[in-house]
Amino acid sequence: RSLMKDLPYLRTDQHGNPAGPHVILLSGSSWAEGSYEYHVNRPVNYILEADAEKRVFLEKTRFFESGFLERISGAGDDQRVAQLRAATQKAVDLIISEYERKAGKILLVVNSYAQALEVQQTLETALRKANCSAHTCRMIADAINAPSGEDTVRRGEVSRFAQMNADILIAPAMAIERGHNIVDEYGHSALSAVFFMV
């Protein structure tokens, strides 16, 4: 980021003003004031707006709290897995409802790769019990020495989830947070619902 920000100062005029090369930074996720990792500390000069029809579509996005009392983050190690299983069981009807809408794929966000495995196992059992044909896939670390299959996808290959047969992706928050585009053949998000299991 520093190289990109300071590249215009490679050459300066007689007054010390940048003379190029010129740089345009385009990102929808580089304004995170206070973050040394993500923030580009330069003033925003322009904002690109989506087409009116896309803005209208996005305005229809619904956010809601499940009302479940289970909290995974902050729970003791001995309770965390039980809380995660309970939250997954309670979310099954909501997940099935989203799956049956056939609006797109579903993302479940968890706190770790271990939790992704736990949720996948719990959810697969619950889906079969409910006679739901949805299939799950969980993200695995790139460093894992095992091939990805239909029920796993490596972090570095997660963009291919859009083309996989699986309907539900389970991924850790820190692994999916930035730089991953899960899009259909038209460049639109392949995801229709996101559940935060945290």
Please provide the spans of the model-predicted regions.
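ASCE RecA-like P-loop NTPase motor cores
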Residues: R1-V198
